[in-house]
UniProtKB/Swiss-Prot annotation:
The VP3 protein is one of the five proteins (with VP1, VP4, VP6 and VP7) which form the inner capsid of the virus. Pfam families: Orbi_VP3 (PF01700). Disulfide bonds: none annotated. InterPro entries: Inner_layer_core_VP3_Orbivir, Inner_layer_core_VP3_Reovir. GO terms for molecular function: structural molecule activity. This is Core protein VP3. The keyword tRNA-binding does not apply. It is found in: Virion. The gene is Segment-3. Belongs to the orbivirus VP3 family. The lineage of its organism: Viruses, Riboviria, Orthornavirae, Duplornaviricota, Resentoviricetes. The keyword rRNA processing does not apply. Keywords: Virion. GO terms for cellular component: virion component.
Amino acid sequence: MAAQNEQRPERIKTTPYLEGDVLSSDSGPLLSVFALQEIMQKVRQVQADYMTATREVDFTVPDVQKILDDIKTLAAEQVYKIVKVPSISFRHIVMQSRDRVLRVDTYYEEMSQVGDVITEDEPEKFYSTIIKKVRFIRGKGSFILHDIPTRDHRGMEVAEPEVLGVEFKNVLPVLTAEHRAMIQNALDGSIIENGNVATRDVDVFIGACSEPIYRIYNRLQGYIEAVQLQELRNSIGWLERLGQRKRITYSQEVLTDFRRQDTIWVLALQLPVNPQVVWDVPRSSIANLIMNIATCLPTGEYIAPNPRISSITLTQRITTTGPFAILTGSTPTAQQLNDVRKIYLALMFPGQIVLDLKIDPGERMDPAVRMVAGVVGHLLFTAGGRFTNLTQNMARQLDIALNDYLLYMYNTRVQVNYGPTGEPLDFQIGRNQYDCNVFRADFATGTGYNGWATIDVEYRDPAPYVHAQRYIRYCGIDSRELINPTTYGIGMTYHCYNEMLRMLVAAGRDSEAAYFRSMLPFHMVRFARINQIINEDLHSVFSLPDDMFNALLPDLIAGAHQNADPVVLDVSWISLWFAFNRSFEPTHRNEMLEIAPLIESVYASELSVMKVDMRHLSLMQRRFPDVLIQARPSHFWKAVLNDSPEAVKAVMNLSHSHNFINIRDMMRWVLLPSLQPSLKLVLEEEAWAAANDFEDLMLTDQVYMHRDMLPEPRLDDIERFRQEGFYYTNMLEAPPEIDRVVQYTYEIARLQANMGQFRAALRRIMDDDDWVRFGGVLRTVRVKFFDARPPDDILQGLPFSYDTNEKGGLSYATIKYATETTIFYLIYNVEFSNTPDSLVLINPTYTMTKVFINKRIVERVRVGQILAVLNRRFVAYKGKMRIMDITQSLKMGTKLAAPTV
């Protein structure tokens, strides 16, 4: 027994007023999963009908907590890397010559291997390949140089050869001593200069780098050198404002020494978040609602009032026949407690979540349940004025239930004078003839419910989030007041509650009126807590914008459907009684509360990157129509989604809305101007600027068909042949003469194929030594090097595919232009033992494909030009400098305990 007593946890109760039955404890993420399940039940009713005629969709409820953890992981990721040496931009291929080598731009060589082969009939693959190539540029150039290796030469600091970005060590063994000395002298001249960037000492040197990569590096360096000091001040100032609103102190522990002279700091994200970025996402209102619940809603318990309240008012007699007395001792089931959760979710998200009544024949047959719900429903909910917690149907059903309760003469008979309309509550009751018409719902004025004659939406001091400036004031309670449950609510009241007491007294319901008088402090504490939760904890970028909030009620009444339609949840009649007898008492602030701004910034930044990608991809069809003949906007939407972080996709698709997004939604989102500034967005935009030249992506439309004989030189002087460094390539140095080029469009090719003359026409052009260009289609280009005869499929490959077949007595031809094109370099190697005709064949070998790209991918250079590409200015931070990413400081610090908990 002693062991059992030790294991039993002690229940700590804060004040005597809070004594009661604790039903359950709900945290923000748990409630978000519950809300998501309930919301999905409603959403699926529409979606399932639609999907019966289309494809299947996975309707499993996602794990919100895992999604939040993944987004936090995204915030910790760096879009740049810190390295000691830059990547090799140029390498050299040794030939048999002692004074000539082939210099290869490794960027183009690596870029040619990125992505899939482009075809005309797979636009989604084309879009995906473009994104992969753009991300390759961004990733390749996003580096910061730190602690580069150097050496001392005659009192000067000189860069080590591997820092220069040129790989030439394989060339040195074949060079003469004179050439090696010349290169060594050039290396000794790579002096490190001392520079000053943003009051920080840095090393400056000249190195080699490919143009697209250097653009990204230069943009990143410019971002760092701009210091971002004002952005940091704005972010910290905004966090302090938000902390004041949410009762959280901002912690500056990360920022204690970032201003020291030995520290370089990078701010990758910014605050505040542009809310327009989050709310512009198509069909995102439900996802944003769930994120608001998961990141902001506190953990709480459902507290029952002091049981003596009902015992001395409703059940004081031995025999009790009234509806309230009958329900006093009832115990809720699990399903009814779920309905209580729905009711409190609807109260915390007014207008966004509205309630309707379940069709439950059992409860409809129980008049006591309906009548009690009709009374407490008018005291729990707001129906009109500025917002509503109810549908019009539920408000009318509550009016009918209240009407039945007032006319149920179970104690003493009371005089009733009926009105002429026959509407619910159209009568006067009691000796003083109280007019009950005022309790009939009127959504225009809020009459009959909590919004009656109260200011329940207020605009006062500017809120941190510019899109949500409203303050909710249920029952006219100001959320700035401090709540002491033992005394709060005593002597407080509001119009609807007063009128309900007057009407109950007029109807002869003295016991019930006494019960509600005793419940008034508990009732006011309930709504004071809800007001504080809404106006403090739930204030977030995921909060519904004011313009949408103000339009919810008029649209609901008019039956108009807008971007943010309310979610309707069904509750039972008896759950209204249980909700009235329980109050949501927050016990712990949400654990995500202090990191929520960082999560919001990461999410908005990723959305902005996606939008920039989609904007550029949407232009592709106009720039290159031949390769995107069958393209639709949905293709680049899917391509961007597939290459986006899983966590961001999961947030966007919390309610499985992606299956129902149409082209109008997508194009509207793409054209909206809102973006969230961040380092990742800056680098992505620069990568797209570099990718505007498609030749930098190793894509080209300058592919020609021309019959050319593979060179077979005589080896009369082998030494001279080796010194020249002889090689052959199908890469053109200039496009062919335009009067010798025949432009073959798809229409011409189809016409000749239908006439059965396609091959013959091409053969005639080849015999005339002319050139054929097949349309303006973009092709994937690969770069390959050979020191022996290349395979025949490369040598004799054609820049198109032409297939014919016969079926049913008819001939069919298939023509495709978008094929993979290979730029090959054949390096001739000979030995002194070779005879003059060693390279000569009886029958010549022909090559059929020629490519022109206006880039210096490979060039033959003399040994003295090996280091001629050192023309880029690099900035490197000294080894004793610290590089800090202070993005993680953009989160609030310690949550303050509520003064009354």
